[in-house]
Amino acid sequence: MTEHRLEPTPETTVDVFSRDTAPVLAVEPGDTVVVRSLDAIGHLERQQKPGEVQPLMFEPRRGHCLTGPIEVHGAEPGTVLAVRLLSMRPGDWGWTAAATKDNWLTRRLGLADGPPSRLLWELDAERGVGINDRGHSVALAPFLGVIGLPPAAGGEHSTNPPRAEGGGNIDCRELVAGSTLYLPVTVPGALLHLGDGHAAQGDGEVGGTAIECPMTTEVVLDVITEPAAPGIHAVTPAGRITFGFHPDLNEAMAEALDAMLVWMQALLALDGDDAKATALAVASAAGDLRITQVANDTWGVHAVLPHGAIG
């Protein structure tokens, strides 16, 4: 198998999804790709102080600065792209901003009329620690916020909302190194985009941003025809994961749970009229529901079945 490397340049980055964008790299199933991505908004130079304006890859900017698209030979609608995340190494700096928008949440929290907070982080990937300009330190757990394919429909599509069709801005903190994300293929060649590095993030991404940072990611890309679960799903060091995306958090929860119940019926070899109800009963004892993010208008919930939770 071949190893490829992809750097972020004006020719290899985009800020919208489109099936019409020509691939910047074509690979075979099983190939390894080392992808370097800028931070979410595409800073070309690091900030020296919180909130400092620096040149961006795209001005004006329409969405996340993503590296790609990557064509995978043999990936066609009806197949699934397996993205195996071998390693993720954040850059040496990152930023976080909160209460920057006047929306229902900032109004509910009494923050809409006050000043926002902007933090600048020094990131030590070797030690796995980030320290911000206020002196707070957090453990790093790097992952990519955006791993996605363009929608099947033509035209340009925002990178902001995660989609059941193609994934994208999933923002799931579970997708660390050692995980495999399974994306049903939406367009010929898959046209994978990667970016939006997060050095650390809590469930919910409650402030609207994580520790946003450049990232170097090593992936192995493969094409499978018989996925273990419906829709977008993952196997991570923590367990099996299914996702739901919807502006209504209740609907997002139901989507994630429904996909997990289908997966559990197969895992537990359940059959009969009560198979799904039995899966729900077992999930109630051994599974988890977590709010992925409330930052992207289309909210996310993921269901988690931890490894070894069921004997």
Model regions and ranges:
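N-terminal, Lys/Arg-enriched amphipathic/low-complexity engagement segments
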Residues: 1-58
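Short, structured beta-strand/loop micro-motifs enriched in basic residues and often containing a Trp
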Residues: 8-18, 59-67, 158-166
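Short, Lys/Arg- and Gly-enriched loop/turn segments at beta-strand edges
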Residues: 40-51, 88-98, 189-199, 292-295
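Conserved mixed alpha/beta catalytic, RNA-binding, or beta-rich assembly cores of soluble enzyme
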Residues: 140-169, 173-250
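A hydrophobic, small-residue-rich beta->alpha segment in the mid-to-C-terminal subdomain
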Residues: 227-282
